[in-house]
Structure formats: structure tokens, C-alpha cells
């Protein structure tokens, strides 16, 4: 029950951040299109800082085992759910924004502060495992779908700052190399902005929309159902039958972290990707806002369901 309450509080905080972005545009201080600069800062600066900082922990056999369990669970989620969501997209004729909003969760913005508040800072590393796996899919699958590119540009993918930060973080962890305290503290400070910055972008975009159009669009409610109910239930079944929780003494906690990452609202980075590559960023932002609001109810319920079945 404590986790469920903290979940609701964290999501409510994110929604207030969206409101701040909304108000700064409505007050005439900024325009909704000004959010594009902040989107690029989140994608190419803040998220890499989160990843590098998370991997600055001591190398121990227990940590490695936990990382492997978290990685296996994260990869299982990403691969199986990709096929499932793609199938749903064909059946229900989902467009690029809808498919990516259903598939990609807002783990980068919500999971780190949530895990820190509920489980402690020492567990943030395992939440970043899911983020890292999702980032690989994000900069391959999501980028291709949103940008409408015919094929993958592997050179751009490999040289992407987010992908580089994942490999550098892993390398530093396994070699035991620790960054100077000044550098690591700087990474932590910049990385802590990921939630507020992403939510402010969403709010700024939301301010430029027609509310009646948003809430009259029945597609948004269907996408919200898929993102917050259908996908979490599929993930719950997968995690239950995989028995990955039995592979480590901390297995149940590791599975909880991965499940929390899966059941978050639609990724605000989809909105930012749409901005960068000229897709429908306002529709993506509307989905993000509606799913964030609805997740105040759905996330605690899903966590309670997980605790009942594991």
C-alpha cells in the first residue's frame, strides 16, 4: 500500500510540472514551439547524464547478478511487447504516434525518482537497466517509425550520445573506474532535471492545443487503455510465467522495478522525438497528458495486482 501511495504522489507531482509548462505559455512568457530547444536538451544532455551517473556504483557479484536479472526482464518486456503492440497496431490501425505512445513508457522520467523515494538510491542502477534497454529500441525502432525513414542509419545510431553513454557507463562499472566526485555530482545534478524538464515540455505543447479537440478525440482514450491497462497486464503475465524473480535473492524487488518502468504513462520522449523529426508532437503530448492523469489511478492498482500474483 505504501508503494501505491508514493506512486500516486510522484505522478501528481509530474502533473503539476506539466501545469507549470502550460501556464508559462498561457502567460505569454514563452510560445509552445519554444519547447523544441528544451526537448533537445533532455534527449541529448540530461538523459545521458542520468545513465552515466547510475552506473557509478561498486562492482560486486550481487550487483552483477541483479543487473543480469533486471536486464533479462527488461529485454523480455521490450521484445515481446514490441511484437504485441505491433500486432495491435495492425488490428486497430494505429498511426506512428499511437504505436510509439503505447509501446514506450515514461520510465526515464518517473522510475528514477520513484525508486529513489520508495526503495532507496542504491536501487536506481537497476531502473536504469530498463531505461538503457528501452533507449536502444527508442533510437532504432521509435526513431524509424516517427521519422518515417526507410531504413536504419546504423552509424548515427552507434554514434548517438545516448547509446554512447550506455556503453561508457557499462564500461566504467565493469572496470571499476570511478569518475571524480566533482564530475559525478555534476552528472547527478543535471540528471535530476529529467522529470521536470520533460514534463514542462509536455505542458508547453499542451498549451497550444484545442482542449475540446483533445478530449473529444475518442482515440486518445483507447490509446490510454492500451498503454495503462492492456500492456501492463501482458507484462504481468510475462513476468509471472518467466520465474525471473526466483533467480536472485532480490528478485521480487528487481521485478517490481522493471514492472514499474513498464506501467508508467506514455513516454514524453515520444513527444520530443516528434518535435525533432516533424511528426504530430501535439497529439503525442495530448496522449502523454491524458495517460499521466489516468496513471494516478492505474499504476497503484497494477502494483497491488503484481504483489498479489508474485
Give the predicted meaning of each segment.
Residues 1-310:
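Alpha-helical transmembrane segments of multi-pass small-molecule/ion transporters
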Amino acid at each position: 500500500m505504501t508503494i501505491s501511495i508514493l506512486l500516486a504522489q510522484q505522478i501528481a507531482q509530474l502533473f503539476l510540472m506539466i501545469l507549470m509548462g502550460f501556464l508559462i505559455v498561457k502567460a505569454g512568457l514563452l510560445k509552445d514551439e519554444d519547447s523544441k530547444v528544451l526537448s533537445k536538451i533532455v534527449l541529448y544532455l540530461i538523459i545521458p547524464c542520468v545513465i552515466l551517473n547510475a552506473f557509478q556504483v561498486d562492482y560486486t557479484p550481487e550487483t552483477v547478478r541483479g543487473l543480469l536479472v533486471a536486464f533479462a526482464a527488461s529485454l523480455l518486456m521490450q521484445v515481446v511487447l514490441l511484437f504485441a503492440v505491433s500486432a495491435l497496431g495492425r488490428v486497430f490501425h494505429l498511426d506512428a504516434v499511437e504505436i510509439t505512445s503505447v509501446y514506450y513508457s515514461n520510465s526515464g522520467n518517473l522510475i528514477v525518482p520513484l525508486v529513489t523515494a520508495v526503495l532507496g538510491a542504491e536501487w536506481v542502477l537497476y531502473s536504469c537497466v530498463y531505461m538503457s534497454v528501452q533507449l536502444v529500441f527508442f533510437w532504432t525502432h521509435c526513431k524509424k517509425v516517427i521519422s518515417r525513414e526507410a531504413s536504419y542509419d546504423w552509424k548515427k545510431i552507434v554514434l548517438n550520445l545516448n547509446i554512447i553513454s550506455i556503453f561508457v557507463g557499462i564500461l566504467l562499472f565493469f572496470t571499476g573506474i570511478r569518475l571524480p566526485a566533482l564530475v559525478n555530482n555534476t552528472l547527478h545534478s543535471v540528471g535530476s532535471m529529467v522529470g521536470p524538464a520533460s514534463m514542462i515540455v509536455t505542458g508547453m505543447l499542451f498549451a497550444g492545443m484545442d482542449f475540446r479537440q483533445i478530449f473529444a478525440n475518442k482515440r486518445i482514450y483507447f490509446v490510454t487503455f492500451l498503454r495503462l491497462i492492456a500492456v501492463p497486464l501482458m507484462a504481468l503475465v510475462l513476468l509471472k510465467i518467466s520465474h525471473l524473480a526466483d533467480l536472485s535473492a532480490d528478485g521480487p524487488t528487481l521485478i517490481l522495478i522493471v514492472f514499474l518502468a513498464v506501467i508508467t504513462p506514455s513516454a514524453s520522449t515520444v513527444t520530443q522525438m516528434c518535435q525533432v523529426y516533424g511528426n504530430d508532437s501535439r497529439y503525442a503530448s495530448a496522449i502523454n497528458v491524458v495517460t499521466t492523469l489516468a496513471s494516478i489511478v492505474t499504476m497503484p492498482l497494477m502494483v497491488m495486482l503484481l504483489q498479489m500474483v508474485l
